[in-house]
Amino acid sequence: PACDKQLKTGACVGKRCLSPKPCKNLRVTHEDYLALLRKLRALPNVKKVFIRSGLRFDYMMLDDDPSFLRELVEHHVSGQLRVAPEHASDAVLMTMGKPPISVFKRFAAAFKRATKKAGLKQYLVAYLMSSHPGATLADAVELAEFVRDMGYNPEQVQDFYPTPSTISTCMYYTGLDPRTMEPIYAAKTPHEKAMQRALIQYRNPKNRKLVELSLIHI
């Protein structure tokens, strides 16, 4: 359970543990996860146990105990760790239920320090998404600047695709944020979705024309 309250009464209605900010009742610990990884490492004939993705970096940043990040870097990363900041615009991240981009930057810095201390060469691969409800071309430019500043060169970018029973899909089809009932923009034409994606992959020469059109359009 995320907290003692959830253990007794179940999940809170209309609330998220980590969004828009971490709940004060949230129990932050990686002890069980770390204990499992240590047991796996101790198994005979097991040389390595790699974690490729699936970690919540915002949750990791709430943990005052550095043991998990240290052991993750030392034993469980095979060169690259895939994480999901998804966007760089705080407004878009809010619609996604994700933390501000500053949290990811703190995690990236902590990962880099831990990697250097371990004497290893390991890198973060950022999972990014274009055209999520709430994202405009201006937001895509902000994401492109983040990609530039972090030294990333994303070969793949996930374009938002509506799937059933998600808040994001509700936003996409209704044009409303169901949590606030405020109007929300969603890119729907193939052309604008392509422009947002091209801005993120602006280093690709094939995207030059779309990037120019995007900047003119803004």
Q: Where are the regions that the model predicts?
A:
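Catalytic cores of alpha/beta
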Residues: P133-R148
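Structural recognition of alpha->loop->beta junctions
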Residues: L69-S78, E145-Q158
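Conserved SAM/AdoMet-binding glycine-rich loop
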Residues: P1-V125, S130-P133
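Radical SAM enzyme [4Fe-4S]-AdoMet core and its adjacent flexible, acidic
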Residues: C3-E31, M94-M96, P100-S102, R148, ...
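Alpha/beta catalytic cores of nucleotide-metabolism and tRNA/nucleoside-modifying enzymes
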Residues: T180-S214
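S-adenosyl-L-methionine
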Residues: T136, Q158-D159
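Conserved small/polar residues in nucleotide/adenosyl-binding loops
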Residues: I216-I218
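Catalytic cores of glycan-processing enzymes that make or break glycosidic bonds
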Residues: R52, L143, G175-L176
